[in-house]
Amino acid sequence: MDFENLFSKPPNPALGKTATDSDERIDDEIDTEVEETQEEKIKLECEQIPKKFRHSAISPKSSLHRKSRSKDYDVYSDNDICSQESEDNFAKELQQYIQAREMANAAQPEESTKKEGVKDTPQAAKQKNKNLKAGHKNGKQKKMKRKWPGPGNKGSNALLRNSGSQEEDGKPKEKQQHLSQAFINQHTVERKGKQICKYFLERKCIKGDQCKFDHDAEIEKKKEMCKFYVQGYCTRGENCLYLHNEYPCKFYHTGTKCYQGEYCKFSHAPLTPETQELLAKVLDTEKKSCK
């Protein structure tokens, strides 16, 4: 029976294949379900992450996938060729940059030297003009010196030399020896056979001991009353050229009463010929003013 059944109902030759196919389909369905569940989990995690960090975050699955791909392609990659080409290009660009930089640095000092030369030209011209002027002045001075050679010089230098030689010899100074007579008459006054400095007599001589004229004289006051003394603020005091308390009091000497008494600013002393003349002048001026 069994043998007949085999010929009448032969076994299905594809039965083994279908069984294996069904098993594989079941395994694929399980894998897809697992992958879908993993993808859903990843989506949920991404939704929970803020927007700022979503793009930066990388799933571990994708990173593993990338690593595997990089390992697979490392053997067949062309990185070595690309890197060599990029290095060659970089070296060429670097050489070009260095050459351009050197050219620019070489051009800058030339321009600066040109500018400095342009700036220095007016200064150099000014300096030349100054040197020419100085040389011209020196030439004039030399000519002036040549005009008056010898010991017979007429001028301030000669006077100083002669006075210095006299002082060394111990002789008395002769200040007026080398001065013209017109100059002496203009600036002096004769007193007792001496030429006295008229500015000294007026108390206006500034030179003092260095004055060329004599100061050996008594200063006589002018026979006039000091108007500042009458007003009460003459600052010169005893050095004033005008009369102060020497002037005669017209009230006392005319017989009228002087109300100032001892405190009078003018003199109550007996009249002298000089003071009598002064009193007469005062009385004459008053009579003329009354008329």
Curated annotation (Swiss-Prot):
GO terms for molecular function: DNA-binding transcription repressor activity, RNA polymerase II-specific; RNA binding; RNA polymerase II intronic transcription regulatory region sequence-specific DNA binding; zinc ion binding. The modification Phosphothreonine is found at residue 32. It is found in: Nucleus. Component of the little elongation complex (LEC), at least composed of ELL (ELL, ELL2 or ELL3), ZC3H8, ICE1 and ICE2. Interacts with ICE1 (via C-terminus domain). Acts as a transcriptional repressor of the GATA3 promoter. Sequence-specific DNA-binding factor that binds to the 5'-AGGTCTC-3' sequence within the negative cis-acting element intronic regulatory region (IRR) of the GATA3 gene. Component of the little elongation complex (LEC), a complex required to regulate small nuclear RNA (snRNA) gene transcription by RNA polymerase II and III. Induces thymocyte apoptosis when overexpressed, which may indicate a role in regulation of thymocyte homeostasis. Residues 127-148 have a biased composition (Basic residues). GO terms for biological process: apoptotic process; negative regulation of DNA-templated transcription; negative regulation of T cell differentiation in thymus; positive regulation of thymocyte apoptotic process; positive regulation of transcription by RNA polymerase III; response to antibiotic; snRNA transcription by RNA polymerase II; snRNA transcription by RNA polymerase III. Residues 168-177 have a biased composition (Basic and acidic residues). GO terms for cellular component: Cajal body; chromatin; euchromatin; histone locus body; nuclear body; nucleoplasm; nucleus; transcription elongation factor complex. The keyword Transmembrane does not apply. It holds the Pfam family zf_CCCH_4. The lineage of its organism: Eukaryota, Metazoa, Chordata, Craniata, Vertebrata. This is Zinc finger CCCH domain-containing protein 8.
